Swiss-Prot record:
Belongs to the peroxisomal membrane protein PXMP2/4 family. Keywords: Membrane, Mitochondrion, Mitochondrion inner membrane, Transmembrane, Transmembrane helix. This is Protein SYM1. One of its GO terms (cellular component) is mitochondrial inner membrane. It comes from Mycosarcoma maydis. Its main location: mitochondrion. It comes from the Eukaryota. Signal peptide: none annotated. It is a multi-pass membrane protein. GO terms for biological process: ethanol metabolic process. The lineage of its organism: Eukaryota, Fungi, Dikarya, Basidiomycota, Ustilaginomycotina.
Length: 199
């Protein structure tokens, strides 16, 4: 096990640590987006990274911890296949749509936007982002429910979320940062196209 994986595993066993891990991983995703995709270099938007870290630690992780640890674990069938199929279906029919909307709404408000601006951002970005989410998370969550012990499922999601958080950061910036919007749209379209081919 790599040092990075051991670090995440060590910080994913309790609720406060899960929140800390979520904050770190959202910050990591945004840093990758800004430095490797947007090529910002010294123009790195620290406030944006802080906002996403705050969202990951204080909004997403607490809700995800409850969802995986308390809600989905109540689903029990005698058949393992039925268990997996039901949990993945519930996760993608309920949690994914809600979390996508929550991300765009919460981050817009955290940027200083109005409720109307948050609503508009959700309307324009929710469905394209949700389709991309399904392309990634349906296979990921199937593996998660089938192979990963319940206590480590949020850890597994967090590791994959580094890449997903990078995409969300780019997608959010493309909808609000006009200075770099053309390049960001190219990156968003590339990811969406690749994941659409998995359907």
């Amino acid at each position: 096990m790599s040092t990075f994986t051991r670090l995440i595993a060590a910080t994913s066993s309790t609720f406060p640590r899960q929140c800390l891990t979520g904050g770190v991983l959202f910050a990591t995703g945004d840093t990758i987006a800004q430095q490797l995709v947007e090529k910002r270099g010294s123009r790195h938007d620290l406030a944006r990274t802080f906002r996403l870290s705050l969202y990951g630690g204080c909004v997403f992780s607490p809700l995800a911890s409850i969802w995986f640890g308390r809600v989905l674990e109540r689903v029990r069938f005698s058949s393992k296949a039925a268990n997996i199929a039901t949990k993945v279906a519930l996760d993608q029919a309920i949690a994914s749509p809600a979390f996508v909307a929550l991300f765009f709404g919460a981050t817009t408000i955290m940027e200083g936007g109005s409720p109307d601006q948050a609503k508009n951002k959700i309307i324009h970005n929710w469905w394209p982002t949700l389709k991309t989410a399904w392309g990634l998370w349906i296979p990921v969550q199937t593996l998660n429910m089938a192979l990963v012990p319940p206590s480590q499922r949020l850890l597994f999601v967090n590791v994959v979320s580094i890449f997903w958080n990078t995409f969300l950061s780019i997608k959010s910036a493309a909808a609000s940062d006009h200075a770099v919007k053309p390049n960001l749209n190219d990156a968003v379209e590339l990811v969406e196209t690749k994941l659409d081919k998995l359907h």
